[in-house]
Amino acid sequence: MSIKKRLTILFTPILTGLILTALIACGDKPGTTEKTAAGETAAGQRDTPVLPEVKTVPMTEEVTWLTNDAEPLFSSPDAVKGGTFREALLSFPLTFRTVGPDSNSSFRSAILGNQLSLIGIHPNTEQIIPELATHWAYGKDKKTMYFKLNPAARWSDGVPVTAADFAYSLDFMRSKYIVAPWYNDYYTQEIERVDIFDDHTLAVVSTKAQPDLHLRLGISPTPRHFYGQLDDEFVQKYNWKIVPNTGPYQISDFQKGKFVKFKRKKEWWGQDLRYFKHRFNVDRVTYTVVRDMNVLWE
């Protein structure tokens, strides 16, 4: 199966499925709004995580770099920006984590939809198109893909996206501390390693030669500077933290048991790129808990 999270416009009709899935509501006191910036604790103090060492290796294979700016656009220049998109939840998500206990809810797609991958798939032609990587190449062993990152790519807290964030993804997904056996197994059995050549060049190596490597190796980054070294407090510590992302929207406000609000970034690094232009047009998206189906359809 593919681990590629195919980026779609976050607010397509697909997300209407959210109203059909009942989550268990949180028991926090109503009436208290919690707004926590990415990288900060609930008390408003910024964490200073210990960062794992970054190891680089020389790139020894000569490859043919590929890119794709020839696919038809699937957005309209006439699209009007602004406004608020409103969606309903039958109950509030149990966590903002996307891995670990209670994370496998339908609301998770709203968070993952704002985390880009190395490459994307064109929705009409099904050809590879750039996302965080501008170029890619295939190794002769038929199990390695090479990538060149867009130097402009940034996390939502302004930190540059680097090859180290993709190597960190492998360590993160294999960690026992995230309490996610499926991810532990997949990232061990399917991906052998991530090689870092420099800040913007890397290789992702599969455990075996296989067709359609791009569907398996076009992984997403994990913000190394945000998490640092993991420990057994991961599940509780990051339950409600807003993790930096690379996509066009970020959680801006939430009240447990009531609502979650997303806001479009004013200066998103990818807004003028060919396959991102004229998309992601609403300014805000609000998910509101409506527990009564009759009220929901009124």
Locate the predicted segments by residue.
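N-terminal lobe/hinge region of extracytoplasmic solute-binding protein
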Residues: 55, 59-74, 83-140, 171, ...
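Bacterial signal peptide processing site
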Residues: 27-29
